[in-house]
Every structure is written in structure tokens, then in C-alpha cells.
Amino acid sequence: MAERGASGGGSGGDSLDKSITLPPDEIFRNLENAKRFAIDIGGSLTKLAYYSTVQHKVAKVRSFDHPGKDVEQDHEPPYEISVQEEITARLHFIKFENTYMEACLDFIRDHLVNTETKVIQATGGGAYKFKDLIEEKLRLKVDKEDVMTCLIKGCNFVLKNIPHEAFMYQKDSDPEFRFQTNHPNIFPYLLVNIGSGVSIVKVETEDRFEWIGGSSIGGGTFWGLGALLTKTKKFDELLQLASRGRHANVDMLVQDIYGGAHQTLGLSGNLIASSFGKSATADREFSKEDMAKSLLHMISNDIGQLACLYAKLHGLDRVYFGGFFIRGHPVTMRTITYSINFFSKGEVQALFLRHEGYLGAIGAFLKGAEQDNPNQYSWGENYAASSGLMSTSPELCPTQRARSGTFDLLEMDRLERPLVNLPLLLDPSSYVPDTVDLTDDALARQYWLTCFEEALDGVVKRAVASQPESMDAVERAEKFRQKYWGKLQTLRHQPFAYGTLTVRSLLDTREHCLNEFNFPDPYSKVKQKENGLALKCFQSVTRSLDSLGWEERQLALVKGLLAGNVFDWGAKAVSDVLESDPQFGFEEAKRKLQERPWLVDSYTKWLQRLKGPPHKCALIFADNSGIDIILGVFPFVRELLFRGTEVILACNSGPALNDVTYSESLIVAERIAAMDPIICTALREDRLLLVQTGSSSPCLDLSLCTSRTTTCMVLPFAMWVLWTKLKSLVEKCLSPLSILLACSVLSAKSRLDKGLAVLVRERGADLVVIEGMGRAIHTNYHALLRCESLKLAVVKNAWLAERLGGQLFSVIFKYEVPTK
């Protein structure tokens, strides 16, 4: 039986090369601000984890204090924009060969200036071997952590925090990688760690797991026997040999024993009846490749059958495989997958992890950071700084990316608040946000990658224009271009590098790269100008709507919503118009819309519903700033309020393209309330609530909504106005203690613990309105909800419109009622 907690072994750590020059800007980022360390040292690879603070720029908006000013005659912008420095938390994970150990430790020691920690958590077999070296170099005490505990903690962490972390490997499919959506409940599962031996662990909860079995036949067996059979000493070279071999030359198959009679047994003739069975009777020599392939099949089948038996014994249908034996090698994943499928008859899933190599380091870090309670936060993968899955050739083991052949990177940003499933999802476990999987659709993948490449010049130009006073804006924008272009080229060759490739992930990666080079909100000035212009038109639009009869007004409101949605700077067809024709406005956008019947047209059904009783509460996910939110969404909100429906208006927490942010929506609502008694009364009576989604994406993932809030997130509007005025006053006149007291008074009267998910439950939301291409077409088009839903957008991309069976500016108006 394998020793409990055994990890991978190997040589390679004896040669400590100090002459290596490390690229610090790319590898050990933010090291000077590192606060806590952990390390997982295997036989040949080391994984380092550290927590650091990152300073970056954020765009802030603040309302001008102009009481009683006529908005229609006001020529000043509705708010001011400032760029401030903000500090956030980030986790860094680096994987490198043990050959680099001493050079890396020297580099860390020379650049470690702000750490307060005196301890480094260490796990893995090498934690003992390198203990003295680490303590000498870093002058930190090494605390050794249990290998299995660290693996489980790390596995739980990545399954909860990284979308598309787990995948099935299907060699003969296109794509080979089938990523799993994050399940709201990851437990229970089986973890099979294949190091030198095999450990099998049943994981039931965050803190409860049990070692239930193992085997002495594991990665060490493959390596050892392989070395004896082939005289090949390196593990990866053994796998390369195996990938080129034909096991049937060495193994005795069922058809070799039974001939054609195997069909009467219900068995395939190609099944292995006896591993290495032919070697006992054949006189000829066998090739190294064939022997390596036979050995790999023998060990993988043994492990697969063992895992399958334990899974069935404990009633589990998910088995995650990890350990140095796996390491993303296609030939290994293929044989294990085949074994699991065969022995379980398809009832048990063999799953692998994108970041399985980091599990021990992540777990060791979490053990050391328990007093900081890192699990109370949500964490997100930073696409700009992470290297993703390594590339693979069809048969051989993974080849390293040319960018960095020795170092592999993962970075995760701490989000401001925990994110949870929207309670209105019909079945969170089967919810898939994205409409099209680009890893699966080659034609769509090539189109969208080309589309994002062609748009890159415009994004760079917009980024530079957003910071006219910055001396280095052009230089930073060029670095952004190179970084994002590189990501797009990686995704052309490895569409699976960051999990399932979608339009959403391409947009999010672009936003991550912009933030990486301190372009937090390239469209801030565009939004400021468009919000100011739209506010001047608000009263005339509502007066026009109020003059219509009821039925005519409902259609006008919907057309207003759709016309507002045209103003999307992320769509080239629109940005070209807006840049060439500055006079293009609300009425012109209405004329662009497809005439009814629309491409998807549920309007008649919606109108019929409006003739019934009002909805209790509507949750509206807004899209763009300017005309969209002010002349499209707010008149629609106003009508719902007039009918007696409460409204929760949800906007992005952070900027993305020209999408409206929560902080901008507060100022816009303040200005509209000064003009409109319906909006003003609803805000004062807490029937119109402004909330943030927790997202900074042009798309919408309903499995990632805010579960709790920070100050002012769901502050009643009158309280927010009072807060902003009082804050301005106390900053000028009062001491810090007085400010603190004033804040505490306001906080006590506000609902600080009610985030979007909580509000939806409390208010009994029975209607969800999702607006815009990113939120209602690229994502959530097929999302099933427990309540009525309205998904509407204007298709502003000709290729997508044609795919949907329409033309540019076709209309999607999809009203759905859940089955009883």
C-alpha cells in the first residue's frame, strides 16, 4: 500500500544554478509588497505562492453640488472624474524547476522589503530537503504542512473560485478539452493523487475528508520500470516514447486469446487481456516505444479501475485526478479517462484540473493565512498575468510556451465581496452563462478572434485619449496592445488555455489587460459627455411618453429601450457611426431599428401580460451609459413604478467599455430625481433601489452576483444624498474622529448586509429584465429563471445577425414565462 500523503519524486534538485538571470517584471511581480509566503517542493518542480498588495489606478466620479440648477440649461458636465490610486490584494503562484531554486531564493531575498511575516509554509517531499536552504536564504522559519491537507484545501479553492477549472479530456473529440461549469456545491468528490504512489481521498466538506485507500503502483512505478525497460531516465522522455508506441505489439489482447469468439463474450477484441503478455512467448526484441506504451496502459488501467471501485463503493460520480503523473500530459489523461469510462460504464467522470500543479502551494498558503480568513472572499483569475494551460501537440507531452520555457504563472485578484448564484436561476447546477462555446465552434472562434484583433487599434486610441495629461499614456497603451495581441495569438493556437473560450472571456481578458497598464476606464469622458447630453433630453422624452395612450406608450417605451441599446461603443458598426456623425441621437437610433415583426418578437405576449396585475418587483440589469440608461431604461423604470412595481436597478460595480457603473447610476438618478416626481418619490420611499452587480464585465454571469454589501451599496437614496453632502462637509470642517462618528450614524440606518442576492429574495422579485448584446445574447440567451424574464437587445454585429437569421440592427425581444 502506498504511504499516506506520498507525493511525486524525482531527481533534478541537486544542481543549483546561481547564474540564471530571472525576468522579475514578468515572473516575481509585486514581490516588494509580498506579505505572506508558501511553497510546495516536489522532486523536480517547485510551486511558490505569495500574497501581495497591488496599487493601481481607478476612475472615480463625484457629483457637483449645484442645488436647484436647471439641468436642461446646464452646460457643465453632470459630474467630475478623477483617477485615484487604490490598493487591492492579489495572489501570485509561480511554478519553476528545482534547478532554479537557489537563484529564485536569492532573488526573493534581495527584493523582499515590505514583508512582516517571519514564517513560510512548506509542503511536499522537498520541504525537508530544502528546509535549511530556505531558512538560510530568506531568514524565514519553515513550517511544514501536511501534504494531503494542502492538496484538499487547494482543490476546494480552485473548484470554488476559478470558472472552468475542471475538464474532461476526450482525445478523439474536437475540442479535446471539455470544461465543466462551476457547480454550486462541489462536494462530495474523490481526489486521486498520483505521485510516486497513489492516494485516494474522499472529500465531503471544506474541512472533512478521509483517506480511503491507495496503491504502491503509481507514477514512481511507471518511472522506475520504464527506466529499467528503456534505459530512459527522464519522466517526460518516457511519456514521449509511450506516445509513439503501439501497445498491441507487447500486450496480449482478447482477440489474441479467443479469436473471433470474443463477440459471444460481449467483449471488444482490442481489450487488453494481459499486459506484456506477448513478451513471454515472442523471440523478437520489443521497441522502447511499445514497452513504454504498454507500461503506461497497465498502470493507468490499474489506477482507473481502483478509482472507479472506490467511487462506486462510496456513491461518488466525480473523480478528480492530480499529481506529477498527470501534469496535463494528453497521453496520460487519455488512458486514465478510457479506464474510468470502461470500468464504470460511463457512470463515473474522470476530471482533471487546469491548475492541479498548484494545489499544494495554494493549500499551504491557505493554512498559513487562516487567521485572515481568505475563504470569506471570492477570488478571480487575472487573465492578463496568468499563463494558462500549456500547449499540447496531438500525441506528445505538453510543449512549453516560447514566452517562458521554465516558469508558469497564475495570478488571482481578491474581489471586493463574495459572489453567489442569483436566487432566481431555475437550476444553478445546469446554468451555463455563455451562449456559444468558441472552443467548440471553429468558425465562430476564427471570426471573433479576428474581430478583436481588428478592433485593437481603436481600443489603443481610446485608451490614450482617455488620459490626455499623462506623459506615458502612449507607451502604456502600446504595452497593452502587445499583451492583448499576444493573448489572442495564444488563443488562436490554444483556445482552451483559459478554460472555455467565449466572447465574454475575450472581452474580460481585454479589460484585465487594460487595467494591467492603468487604463481603468477608457470611456469615462465619453460616458460623462453622453450622460450630460441625455439628461438634458430626459424631460422632453417623458413628456412625449406621457402624452400617449396606454397601449401606444408601452410600445414607445420598448422602442426607447431598444433605441437606447444602440449606443454601444463596443460595437464597431455603432462606434463608426458615432465617430463620423456627432449628431446621431435618440431619434436617429429609433429609425435604425428593425420594423416589427422583430427577429425574436414576444412583444404581443408582453403587452398582454401588462394588462394583468403589476409585478411585485422587477430586477433590471442595465447596459450602457448615456442615452441607454437615461432615455431608455429610466422611462421604462418610471412606468413600472407608476404601475406599482418595485424596481431593483443593477449596474456594473466597475467600468467596462461604455457600460454604466453603479457610481454613475447614483449621480444620474440624483439628477433625474430632481426633474421627475415619480423617480424622486420612489427613491425616497425605497421602492427604487440602485445596486451593484459585483461585475466589471460587458457580459453577465448570473452565478456571480453580490451576496453582501459595503457601505452605500444599497443605501436608500435620500440617505445617499445626505451622506455625500455630509461627507463633503466633514472633510472640510471636522476632525477624523467626527467623520468616523458621522459615518457610523449613517451606517446604522442603512442596510449594509443586503446585497443583490439578498434583495432579490427580500423583495420577492418576479420579473428579470436583461438588456444588451453582452448580457442578453452573448450570455443568458438560454438562461432559465424561476420567474418571468425579458431579454432584449439590438444586434449590432452583422456576422452575428446573419447567424441568428437577421440583419444588422435586428431586434431581440424575448419574453419568457417559466413553466408552472
Swiss-Prot record:
<dbReference type="GO" id="GO:0005829">
    <property type="term" value="C:cytosol"/>
</dbReference>
<feature type="compositionally biased region" description="Gly residues">
    <location>
        <begin position="1"/>
        <end position="13"/>
    </location>
</feature>
<feature type="modified residue" description="N-acetylalanine">
    <location>
        <position position="2"/>
    </location>
</feature>
<dbReference type="InterPro" id="IPR035073">
    <property type="entry name" value="At2g17340_3_helix_bundle"/>
</dbReference>
<feature type="binding site">
    <location>
        <position position="199"/>
    </location>
    <ligand>
        <name>acetyl-CoA</name>
    </ligand>
</feature>
<keyword id="KW-0547">Nucleotide-binding</keyword>
<dbReference type="GO" id="GO:0016791">
    <property type="term" value="F:phosphatase activity"/>
</dbReference>
<comment type="similarity">
    <text>In the C-terminal section; belongs to the damage-control phosphatase family. Phosphopantetheine phosphatase II subfamily.</text>
</comment>
<comment type="similarity">
    <text>In the N-terminal section; belongs to the type II pantothenate kinase family.</text>
</comment>
<dbReference type="GO" id="GO:0015937">
    <property type="term" value="P:coenzyme A biosynthetic process"/>
</dbReference>
<dbReference type="GO" id="GO:0046872">
    <property type="term" value="F:metal ion binding"/>
</dbReference>
<feature type="region of interest" description="Disordered">
    <location>
        <begin position="1"/>
        <end position="20"/>
    </location>
</feature>
<keyword id="KW-0067">ATP-binding</keyword>
<feature type="modified residue" description="Phosphothreonine">
    <location>
        <position position="406"/>
    </location>
</feature>
<feature type="short sequence motif" description="Subfamily II EGMGR motif">
    <location>
        <begin position="771"/>
        <end position="775"/>
    </location>
</feature>
<keyword id="KW-0597">Phosphoprotein</keyword>
<keyword id="KW-0007">Acetylation</keyword>
<keyword id="KW-0464">Manganese</keyword>
<dbReference type="GO" id="GO:0005524">
    <property type="term" value="F:ATP binding"/>
</dbReference>
<feature type="region of interest" description="Pantothenate kinase">
    <location>
        <begin position="2"/>
        <end position="402"/>
    </location>
</feature>
<dbReference type="GO" id="GO:0005615">
    <property type="term" value="C:extracellular space"/>
</dbReference>
<dbReference type="InterPro" id="IPR015844">
    <property type="entry name" value="PanK_long"/>
</dbReference>
<feature type="modified residue" description="Phosphoserine">
    <location>
        <position position="404"/>
    </location>
</feature>
<dbReference type="Pfam" id="PF01937">
    <property type="entry name" value="ARMT1-like_dom"/>
</dbReference>
<dbReference type="Pfam" id="PF03630">
    <property type="entry name" value="Fumble"/>
</dbReference>
<dbReference type="InterPro" id="IPR002791">
    <property type="entry name" value="ARMT1-like_metal-bd"/>
</dbReference>
<keyword id="KW-0944">Nitration</keyword>
<feature type="binding site">
    <location>
        <position position="623"/>
    </location>
    <ligand>
        <name>Mn(2+)</name>
    </ligand>
</feature>
<feature type="modified residue" description="Phosphoserine">
    <location>
        <position position="393"/>
    </location>
</feature>
<feature type="region of interest" description="4'-phosphopantetheine phosphatase">
    <location>
        <begin position="403"/>
        <end position="820"/>
    </location>
</feature>
<keyword id="KW-0479">Metal-binding</keyword>
<feature type="modified residue" description="3'-nitrotyrosine">
    <location>
        <position position="320"/>
    </location>
</feature>
<comment type="function">
    <text>Phosphatase which shows a preference for 4'-phosphopantetheine and its oxidatively damaged forms (sulfonate or S-sulfonate), providing strong indirect evidence that the phosphatase activity pre-empts damage in the coenzyme A (CoA) pathway. Hydrolyzing excess 4'-phosphopantetheine could constitute a directed overflow mechanism to prevent its oxidation to the S-sulfonate, sulfonate, or other forms. Hydrolyzing 4'-phosphopantetheine sulfonate or S-sulfonate would forestall their conversion to inactive forms of CoA and acyl carrier protein.</text>
</comment>
<dbReference type="InterPro" id="IPR036075">
    <property type="entry name" value="ARMT-1-like_metal-bd_sf"/>
</dbReference>
<dbReference type="InterPro" id="IPR043129">
    <property type="entry name" value="ATPase_NBD"/>
</dbReference>
<feature type="binding site">
    <location>
        <position position="659"/>
    </location>
    <ligand>
        <name>Mn(2+)</name>
    </ligand>
</feature>
<dbReference type="GO" id="GO:0015938">
    <property type="term" value="P:coenzyme A catabolic process"/>
</dbReference>
<feature type="binding site">
    <location>
        <position position="196"/>
    </location>
    <ligand>
        <name>acetyl-CoA</name>
    </ligand>
</feature>
<keyword id="KW-0533">Nickel</keyword>
<protein>
    <recommendedName>
        <fullName>4'-phosphopantetheine phosphatase</fullName>
        <ecNumber>3.1.3.-</ecNumber>
    </recommendedName>
</protein>
<keyword id="KW-0173">Coenzyme A biosynthesis</keyword>
<keyword id="KW-0378">Hydrolase</keyword>
